[in-house]
């Protein structure tokens, strides 16, 4: 046999074997990287000890919520984002338990609630919120306090199910999914629409303690010195729960975007807006524009605050909410 042919054949076989070996190693590595993470216990700090933790089923999954107090129902809805949960409001909502029935749920896909492998859409969350409010058997329509993208979802809830909402108090609502200084660019939306890559990036980078801490300090909190170890622990643990990537990746891929302007223009319930002056580059312009869209909406601006006002300056948020919730507050319903 020709020795040159033998060498060529051996070289080709070696390359094929090497390629197969590399491909196999990559598949093993990818399989390892995409393993469901080990379930970690969510820190007790996620809710005050005086609040009972309860669970109700919805069509999207089980909703875990914290409740205390008696009176008119007052529901606090956390923003949608990395490691999000009802912990966002945990320094605020206890202040209202002496005169209200205070309820703080984790949205499905976040916190301690179910985290199904579902391609979430805004209508799914609107329906989930409607089912949740019906399931907790409110004596009357609740006042809803919400932030960010979740605030936008609550506006849609009020438009589609007006009997389930008495009033909306919205902190920096949006329909884009932008969170604080974190912007969802077209490139990030493209990357996070690739399921395997998105899950890989989320599990092995974005949900790590270091990445969560960086995100909180650089994008979410105006004063990074206020990002405590407890805050990092709760956000990182929630981000690392099995299945936490499904809703988060959907959010980062732009799958939860909604038309906030149209919804605000159609809402027939009283709306109050609170805004952080440091929360976004165009904060003042955006807040004024949204105020004009919602009939008779009030606007309270916190010049040195951002999207996480409820944790950075809870006393200021509590004071603003008390002002909005006064019994003698005059509200004007939109005609029709």
Task: Locate predicted features.
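Conserved alpha/beta-hydrolase catalytic His-Asp/Glu region
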Residues: 179-181, 204-265
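Conserved HGGG/HGGXW glycine-rich cap/lid loop of the alpha/beta-hydrolase fold
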Residues: 67-112
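Catalytic active-site module of serine/aspartate enzymes centered on a nucleophile-bearing elbow/loop
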Residues: 295-336
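Active-site loop/oxyanion-hole signature of alpha/beta-hydrolase fold enzymes
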Residues: 90, 103-145, 310, 319
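Hydrophobic alpha-helical topogenic segments used for membrane insertion/localization
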Residues: 9-35
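Conserved loop-alpha-helix segment in the C-terminal half of the alpha/beta-hydrolase fold
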Residues: 266-305
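Flexible "cap/lid" loop of the alpha/beta hydrolase fold
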Residues: 159, 167-199
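A short loop-to-beta-strand scaffold at the N-terminal edge of the catalytic core in hydrolase folds
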Residues: 58-68
């Amino acid at each position: 046999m020709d020795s040159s042919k033998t060498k060529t054949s051996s070289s080709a076989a070696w390359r094929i074997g090497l390629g197969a070996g590399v491909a196999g190693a990559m598949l093993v590595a990818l399989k390892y990287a995409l393993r469901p993470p080990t379930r970690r216990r969510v820190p007790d700090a996620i809710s005050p000890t005086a609040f009972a933790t309860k669970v109700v089923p919805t069509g999207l999954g089980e909703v875990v919520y914290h409740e205390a107090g008696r009176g008119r129902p007052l529901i606090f809805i956390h923003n949608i984002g990395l490691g999000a949960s009802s912990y966002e409001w945990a320094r605020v909502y206890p202040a209202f338990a002496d005169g209200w029935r205070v309820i703080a749920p984790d949205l499905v896909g976040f916190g301690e609630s179910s985290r199904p492998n579902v391609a979430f859409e805004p209508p799914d969350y609107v329906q989930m919120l409607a089912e949740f409010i019906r399931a907790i058997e409110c004596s009357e329509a609740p006042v809803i306090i919400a932030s960010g993208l979740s605030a936008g979802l609550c506006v849609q809830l009020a438009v589609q199910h007006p009997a389930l909402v008495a009033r909306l108090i919205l902190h920096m609502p949006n329909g884009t999914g932008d969170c604080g200084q974190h912007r969802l660019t077209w490139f990030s939306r493209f990357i996070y629409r690739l399921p395997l890559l998105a899950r890989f990036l989320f599990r092995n980078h974005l949900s790590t303690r270091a990445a969560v801490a960086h995100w909180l300090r650089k994008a979410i909190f105006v004063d990074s010195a206020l990002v405590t170890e407890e805050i990092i622990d709760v956000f990182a643990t929630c981000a690392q729960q099995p299945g936490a990537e499904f809703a988060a990746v959907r959010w980062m891929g732009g799958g939860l975007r909604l038309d906030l302007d149209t919804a605000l223009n159609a809402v027939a319930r009283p709306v109050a807006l609170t805004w952080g002056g440091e929360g976004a580059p165009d904060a003042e312009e955006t807040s004024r524009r949204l105020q004009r869209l919602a009939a008779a909406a009030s606007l309270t601006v916190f010049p040195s605050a951002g999207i996480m006002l409820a944790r950075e300056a809870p006393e200021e948020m509590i004071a603003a909410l008390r002002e909005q919730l006064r019994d003698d507050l005059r509200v004007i319903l939109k005609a029709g």
